[in-house]
Each structure stands twice: as C-alpha cells, then as structure tokens.
Amino acid sequence: QRRFGGVENWINYSDDPQIKSAFKRIVSKVEGKPASIDKGRVLRVKNNDQFLFKDNVLKYIDENPEVDFYLFFPPYHRLKHVMWKKYDPSQYEIYKNRVESIVSLAENYNNVQVFGYDNFSFVDDISIYKDTGHYHPKINSLILQWMKNGDGELKPDMLQSYFNEVDKKINEYDLQNIIDLIKHKLEKDDI
C-alpha cells in the first residue's frame, strides 16, 4: 500500500530494490538508442502465445461450454505502454498481437467475452499504481462492474478503434516530467 500515490511516492520508497531497478531500466531505455521492431521476436512470441492460449485457456472453454468466461487484459499504467511504444516497439507489437489473437480466437465461442481497459482514463492516473503493472485493488471491483455492464468488451471489428485510442493517449502522455523526477532522484542518491 505504501507505494500507491504516484511517482513522488515511488521516489520516497526508491530504496525498494524493485523500484530502484525499475527506475534504472526506465532511464537506460530513454537514454539508449531508439529500438526497431524485431519481426522475428514478434512472430515467435505470437506463435507461442497462440499455442499457450489454446493449450491453457481454450482447452477449458471447450470442456465447459455451459460456463461463461470473462477474460480481460490487465490495465497497465500508461507509462508502460509509452515505454514499450517508444523504446521497445517489439514489445508494443507483441502486446497488440496478443490482444488481437485472443480476441479473434475468443470470437469463435458464444460463452467467452474479452475485455480491455487500456483506453480508459484511469490508466493515466499514476496514483492508483504502485508500479507500472500493479494497480490498486479497488480497480478490481470497477473492472468486475464494467464487465457486468459490458463496458470495455473487445470484438475484432473494434480493435482498430481501440488501438487508435490507446495510441492517441500514448502520444499525449507527458513522459518527460516523470523522467526528470526519476533522474533527479537517481542523481541525488548517486544510484
């Protein structure tokens, strides 16, 4: 709980090895050379993802046609998407392929719904994240309510619009302010 509250709070707990490591990774990516898409890596991961999804998820869906399955992609903080798109574009393509593949495969089942929330505004609120991947537990209740209402459901014909919204939010995100705070903390602590 102590790390929720935004980057300033993360900085207050930068003695935490996980936070320290994340800060160093972020700064090294920003200061590194721009990366390009590794199409081989993207394809390998895509093929593996499809195999894993079929073997570990669809298997149970096939075995339980009377059960309704609600699947969702965890809503990472926008900073993670920004870092992927700008500094690890292969990972961003992997993310998009993963969403597309699962939504497409799920479309063949009447008892499966897939949801995504990366286009929702709460993903921009860093205060509800203890790092870029772990949101406050209260978000789980919101996600369940949204799923119940059908909010955020993804269908193949909606994906282009969904990714356009996500990309727009990524492009509008103020990364520099966070980078400056992190660099200042790292320089101050001589990390």
Question: Where do the protein language model's features map onto the residues?
Answer:
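Secreted/periplasmic serine-hydrolase-like ester/acetyl group-modifying domain
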Residues: 1-66, 160-191
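Alpha-helix boundary/N-cap detector
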Residues: 14-17, 93, 138
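C-terminal regions of proteins
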Residues: 99-191
